[in-house]
């Protein structure tokens, strides 16, 4: 979804693209914006958090892109890292709403519990639909059985490598890392789908 705003004190308008984080309902769009504070603070993300309120109007541009969920009634594996969880949340909501009758695996990696967006909601969806969930925290130990410490290890998970469709989203280095693991496990390249934040490129 394209969003255009004119941050206070800025000479020019700014346009940002955001992934949708909820299922389509024909009435509204939901985006989930992380406040960027470290390094060069996010101009638009901070403006949205600090200055935009319910009832304010912003200019939107229709969603577009080549990364979307195709309900093929095959096993589905969603693999994300960091803010790459955003479109995966929308896909999980869609799968639940459509009563997807094939196995679903949700795999996510992040720094720790404080950076784990949507954790409560995804756990609810996984439990309600009898799906599988595996999480990796790089800098935190956790007591839950489905959460591991360290780097994501796809070989440690029982995945539908022959028939599944795999969706990747996150930093490009992470997606390259995940894709190489999938290829080594025997997943066909045509069954690996991904989104790069920026101009589309091959992994």
Description of each model-found segment:
Residues 103-203:
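Reductase modules of NAD(P)H-dependent flavoproteins
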Residues 24, 63, 87, 171-172:
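Proline-centered helix-kink/hinge sites
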Residues 74, 94-104:
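Conserved S-adenosyl-L-methionine
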Residues 61-73:
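A short, basic/flexible loop-to-alpha-helix module at the beginning of a structural domain
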Residues 1-57, 96, 110-112, 123, ...:
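Ferredoxin-reductase
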Residues 14-29, 70-83, 185:
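Short, compositionally biased
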Residues 85-97:
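Histidine-anchored nucleotide/phosphate-binding helix
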């Amino acid at each position: 979804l394209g969003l255009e705003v004119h941050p206070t004190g800025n000479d020019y308008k700014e346009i940002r693209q955001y992934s949708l984080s909820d299922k389509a309902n024909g009435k509204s769009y939901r985006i989930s914006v992380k406040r960027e504070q470290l390094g060069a603070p996010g101009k638009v993300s901070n403006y949205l958090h600090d200055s935009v309120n319910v009832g304010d109007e912003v200019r939107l541009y229709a969603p577009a892109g080549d990364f979307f969920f195709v309900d093929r009634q095959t096993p589905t594996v969603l693999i994300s890292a960091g803010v790459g969880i955003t479109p995966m949340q929308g896909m999980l909501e869609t799968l639940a709403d459509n009563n997807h009758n094939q196995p679903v695996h949700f795999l996510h990696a992040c720094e720790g519990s404080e950076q784990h967006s949507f954790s409560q909601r995804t756990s609810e969806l996984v439990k309600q639909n009898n799906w599988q969930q595996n999480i990796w925290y790089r800098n935190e130990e956790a007591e839950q059985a489905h959460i591991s410490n360290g780097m994501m290890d796809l070989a440690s998970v029982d995945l539908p490598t022959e028939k599944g469709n795999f969706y990747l989203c996150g930093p490009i280095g992470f997606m390259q890392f995940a894709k190489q693991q999938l290829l080594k496990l025997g997943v066909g390249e045509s069954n690996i789908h991904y989104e790069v934040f920026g101009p589309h490129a091959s992994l």
